[in-house]
């Protein structure tokens, strides 16, 4: 087991906002920071970049679309650290609006990574989360636009305090199926797979927070979703108005909430402010 028992993990951390979050955690978090990437060479290059800046991250390969890869990471964290203190679920995919890929394929691939794989990360790693742990799920303000463009019936379901994880999974599966059957608009869905995927992540964060409050309240584990804002990354494009360092501020703020904090919990946070939606 590592001589340092505290550990923070950032997924999709070889570039962009994930790398910026890992960099800032290396500076501020009291413990080891493990950055992950699907591509080993790119992940190790990111580690070398941070080492050149005088920081000391660790690297572990992770493909969040692969459940066995997630479980290998879980076993590593359990063996090396006895668990996990901070989880930042940043890894995601986004298609450009002019991408010629069929809409239903975009929907399936986007939901697979952004929602279902993120859910797998939470379900595999929350059981080893230590007391006062912090889970930060990177969402997007596009989730709010997606919500506004949902039918009233779907809005009520997403807002419901009794919505279960299983119910949410069924809704996300239905969106994918409705796109395949070319009926998603008629069924009340918006035309944004990315927005729907991040809406799912935001609602999942609320459901997981509620479950933790019911089953592990004394551990004070906080789960929140956040929007970094329009950041200059490969995903958001060069014309976005924020640097990756600015985009990392709210995720890092949530990751480093003090041990006695009880809120925010299960919220969507933008610019360190809870969003009402």
UniProtKB/Swiss-Prot annotation:
Catalytic EC class: oxidoreductase
Metal-binding keyword on record: no
Consequence of changing residue 244 to M: Increased carbonyl reductase (NADPH) activity; exhibits a 2-fold higher Vmax with menadione; higher Vmax with NADP(H); does not affect Km for menadione
pH-dependence annotation: Optimum pH is 5.5-7.
Phosphoserine: modified positions: 30
Residues reported in the UniProt entry to bind substrate: 140
Biological process per Gene Ontology, one example term: phylloquinone catabolic process
Reactions catalysed, as given in the entry: a secondary alcohol + NADP(+) = a ketone + NADPH + H(+); a quinone + NADPH + H(+) = a quinol + NADP(+)
Impact upon substituting residue 142 to M: Modest increase in carbonyl reductase (NADPH) activity toward 1,2-naphthoquinone
Modified residues (N-acetylserine): 2
Keywords associated with the record: Acetylation, Cytoplasm, NADP, Oxidoreductase, Phosphoprotein
Enzyme Commission code(s) on record: 1.1.1.184, 1.6.5.10
Binding site for NADP(+): 10-34, 38-42, 63-64, 90, 194-198, 239
Family according to the record: Belongs to the short-chain dehydrogenases/reductases (SDR) family.
Record function comment: Catalyzes the NADPH-dependent reduction of carbonyl compounds to their corresponding alcohols. Has low NADPH-dependent oxidoreductase activity. Acts on several orthoquinones, acts as well on non-quinone compounds, such as isatin or on the anticancer drug oracin. Best substrates for CBR3 is 1,2- naphthoquinone, hence could play a role in protection against cytotoxicity of exogenous quinones. Exerts activity toward ortho-quinones but not paraquinones. No endogenous substrate for CBR3 except isatin has been identified.
Protein name stated in the entry: Carbonyl reductase [NADPH] 3
Lineage, uppermost ranks: Eukaryota, Metazoa, Chordata, Craniata, Vertebrata
Encoding gene (name): CBR3
């Amino acid at each position: 087991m590592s001589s340092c028992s505290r550990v923070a993990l950032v997924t999709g951390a070889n570039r962009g906002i994930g790398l910026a979050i890992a960099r800032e955690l290396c500076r501020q978090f009291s413990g080891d920071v493990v950055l992950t990437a699907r591509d080993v060479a790119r992940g190790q290059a990111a580690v070398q970049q941070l080492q050149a800046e005088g920081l000391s991250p660790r690297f572990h390969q992770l493909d969040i679309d692969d459940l066995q890869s997630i479980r290998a990471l879980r076993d590593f964290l359990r063996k090396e650290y006895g668990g996990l203190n901070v989880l930042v679920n940043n890894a995601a995919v986004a298609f450009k609006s002019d991408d010629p890929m069929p809409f239903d394929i975009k929907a399936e691939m986007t939901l697979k990574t952004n929602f279902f794989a993120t859910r797998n990360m939470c379900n595999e790693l929350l059981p080893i989360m230590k007391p006062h742990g912090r889970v930060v799920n990177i969402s997007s303000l596009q989730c709010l636009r997606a919500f506004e463009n949902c039918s009233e019936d779907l809005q009520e379901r997403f807002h419901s305090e009794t919505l279960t994880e299983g119910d949410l999974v069924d809704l996300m599966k239905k969106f994918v199926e409705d796109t395949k059957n070319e009926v998603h608009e008629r069924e009340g869905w918006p035309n944004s797979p990315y927005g729907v995927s991040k809406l799912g992540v935001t609602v999942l964060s609320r459901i997981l927070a509620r479950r933790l409050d019911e089953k592990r309240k004394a551990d004070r584990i906080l789960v929140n979703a956040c929007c970094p804002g329009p950041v200059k990354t490969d995903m958001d494009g060069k014309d976005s108005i924020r640097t990756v360092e600015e985009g990392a501020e709210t995720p890092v703020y949530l990751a480093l909430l003090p041990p006695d904090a009880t809120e925010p919990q299960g919220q969507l946070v933008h610019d360190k402010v809870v969003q009402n939606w």
